[in-house]
Amino acid sequence: ALWKDILKNVGKAAGKAVLNTVTDMVNE
């Protein structure tokens, strides 16, 4: 279903954003 694909993409984007934030915090 289309909404499932959208949800998956949103989840991936959110996961990447969280990962980037954590990585930035660790690097500082």
UniProtKB/Swiss-Prot annotation:
GO BP annotations listed: defense response
This protein's GO CC annotations: extracellular region
Subcellular location per the Swiss-Prot or TrEMBL entry: Secreted
TM spans (from-to): none
Known tissue expression: Expressed by the skin glands.
Entry keywords, A to Z: Amphibian defense peptide, Antimicrobial, Secreted
InterPro entries listed in its UniProt record: Dermaseptin_dom
Family: Belongs to the frog skin active peptide (FSAP) family. Dermaseptin subfamily.
Function field: Has antimicrobial activity.
Name of the molecule in the record: Dermaseptin-2.2TR
Organism for this UniProt entry: Phyllomedusa trinitatis
Lineage of origin: Eukaryota, Metazoa, Chordata, Craniata, Vertebrata
